[in-house]
């Protein structure tokens, strides 16, 4: 059995859909790291920091188990977009994507008793212009909350994607194809 060390509903749904036997363990992580580095390094450091925090607090309870740590960020060029703190920040992030593109970087660390596997994947989504009413509804109803870069591939953004380069599961927060290869 896999232990998903994350409160992400999206990641849990991806594992269920892939028929991977898992148990979800929610943990409140401090994700405040210096964002003045490349987005690729940033998401990797976040995953390693999640592992460190989880093991320092709950490590005794999960010895010799298969643990999965994951994180996703959105970047536009080299600008890192994490989770919006409020509606103003959500509107700013969405304005950067409107009629343009955004890349989702998803990293995971699979810790097994006999090995460690680290994976970094990228999916780029290209968008047509957002409908202003749909955008306002999305933000004003707080649907952006908890979403890296305010991106909701299975919701708001779905209607505006013109091209996708990479796996949908990566855009949703976990590269399932790669994970399955190492389970």
From Swiss-Prot:
Known EC number: 3.6.1.9
One Gene Ontology term, aspect cellular component: cytoplasm
One Gene Ontology molecular-function label: nucleoside triphosphate diphosphatase activity
Keyword terms of this UniProt record: Cytoplasm, Hydrolase, Nucleotide metabolism
Subcellular location: Cytoplasm
CDD domains: Maf
Keyword match Cytoplasm: yes
Pfam families given in the database record: Maf
Reaction it catalyzes: a ribonucleoside 5'-triphosphate + H2O = a ribonucleoside 5'-phosphate + diphosphate + H(+); a 2'-deoxyribonucleoside 5'-triphosphate + H2O = a 2'-deoxyribonucleoside 5'-phosphate + diphosphate + H(+)
Cofactor(s) listed: a divalent metal cation
Record-level GO BP terms: nucleotide metabolic process
NCBIfam families: maf (TIGR00172), PRK04056.1 (NF003141)
Function field: Nucleoside triphosphate pyrophosphatase. May have a dual role in cell division arrest and in preventing the incorporation of modified nucleotides into cellular nucleic acids.
PANTHER family: BIFUNCTIONAL DTTP/UTP PYROPHOSPHATASE/METHYLTRANSFERASE PROTEIN-RELATED, BIFUNCTIONAL DTTP_UTP PYROPHOSPHATASE_METHYLTRANSFERASE PROTEIN-RELATED
Family assignment from sequence similarity: Belongs to the Maf family.
Name by which UniProt lists this protein: Nucleoside triphosphate pyrophosphatase
Species: Campylobacter jejuni subsp. jejuni serotype O:2 (strain ATCC 700819 / NCTC 11168)
């Amino acid at each position: 059995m896999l232990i998903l060390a994350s409160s992400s509903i999206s990641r849990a749904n991806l594992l269920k859909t892939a028929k991977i036997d898992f148990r979800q363990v929610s943990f409140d992580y401090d994700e405040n790291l210096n964002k003045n580095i490349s987005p690729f390094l940033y998401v990797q450091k976040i995953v390693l920091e999640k592992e460190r925090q989880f093991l320092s607090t709950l490590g005794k309870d999960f010895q010799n188990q298969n643990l999965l740590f994951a994180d996703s960020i959105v970047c536009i060029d080299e600008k890192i977009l994490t989770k919006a703190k409020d509606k103003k920040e959500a509107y700013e992030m969405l304005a950067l994507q409107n009629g343009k593109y955004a890349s989702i970087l998803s990293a995971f660390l699979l810790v097994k008793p006999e090995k460690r596997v680290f994976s970094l994947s990228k999916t780029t989504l290209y968008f047509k212009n957002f409908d202003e009413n749909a955008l306002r509804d999305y933000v004003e109803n707080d649907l952006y909350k908890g979403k890296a870069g305010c991106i909701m591939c299975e919701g708001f953004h779905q209607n505006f994607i013109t091209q996708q380069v990479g796996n949908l599961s990566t855009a949703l927060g976990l590269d399932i194809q790669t994970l399955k290869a190492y389970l």
